[in-house]
Amino acid sequence: MRIPLIAGNWKMNKSVTEARQFIDAVQGQLPQADVIETAVAAPALFLQTMLDANAEGTLRVAAETCYYEDEGAYTGETSPRALHEMGIPYTIVGHSERRRYFNETDDVINRKVQAVFRNGMTPILCCDETMGRRTAGEKIHWVVNQVSAALKGVSAEDAAKIVVAYEPSWAIGSGTSASSDQAEEGCYLIRQTLADIYSDDLANGVRVLYGGSVKPDNIAGLMAKSNVDGVLAGGSSLDETSFIQLANYQNL
């Protein structure tokens, strides 16, 4: 059984004080983790504060990125080893904004995936799709290649634990979500790619999320799809009330 995962990605938003206020506001308002798992990826500056404030909570505190080396002369980077020692369970890898603004290549993303696994955490691997590639009919080739490249050299034992997010960049921050059918199509394609690389059994156990303008008013339709196991929400995860609604989508 795949436990739904409702995850937020704050990107470069909020202050330490606001992060603590968010944790306080959602306490007792989220489902139990064995029913619906919830997580928020936050800037590295806030992680320890959030972990401390959330000591008794069900919310998972996640990282937005990390480097592929555990330590060394890499000014400004975040060590995956340090994240693990802090108690961070998830790290986002391969978000379209990291690919676009920081020139992260498939090779870099693959090395980051392996670093996250090496340090006992779980990657939330993001797969991008541009509108140009969708209209040009290159969607399948593009998404398959991203998944395959990110998992190069990753064992089946590790791959079975990964979370993959289908995030069409034409929907991110646009206010226009993919339709539930489009989300299902993308998530199904990712699952089939995992089956081709590893096995049907492994693919059927991996959680695949949808991300891109997810809101309380469209999450129920997305979560009704058989291959959509959760969401990776951006803007709607910044507001406490909105995030609580996302997490409790079954009541909407």
From Swiss-Prot:
Its EC number is 5.3.1.1. It is found in: Cytoplasm. Keywords: Cytoplasm, Gluconeogenesis, Glycolysis, Isomerase. It is an enzyme of class 5 (isomerase). The active site is at H95, E167. It catalyses: D-glyceraldehyde 3-phosphate = dihydroxyacetone phosphate. Pfam families: TIM (PF00121). InterPro entries: Aldolase_TIM, TIM_sf, TrioseP_Isoase_bac/euk, Triosephosphate_isomerase, Triosephosphate_isomerase_AS. GO terms for biological process: gluconeogenesis; glyceraldehyde-3-phosphate biosynthetic process; glycerol catabolic process; glycolytic process. Substrate binds at N9, W10, K11, G173, S213, G234, G235. One of its GO terms (molecular function) is triose-phosphate isomerase activity. GO terms for cellular component: cytosol. It comes from the Bacteria. Pathway: Carbohydrate biosynthesis; gluconeogenesis; Carbohydrate degradation; glycolysis; D-glyceraldehyde 3-phosphate from glycerone phosphate: step 1/1. Disulfide bonds: none annotated. The keyword Transmembrane does not apply. Homodimer. Involved in the gluconeogenesis. Catalyzes stereospecifically the conversion of dihydroxyacetone phosphate (DHAP) to D-glyceraldehyde-3-phosphate (G3P). HAMAP family: TIM_B. Belongs to the triosephosphate isomerase family. This is Triosephosphate isomerase. It comes from Levilactobacillus brevis (strain ATCC 367 / BCRC 12310 / CIP 105137 / JCM 1170 / LMG 11437 / NCIMB 947 / NCTC 947) (Lactobacillus brevis).
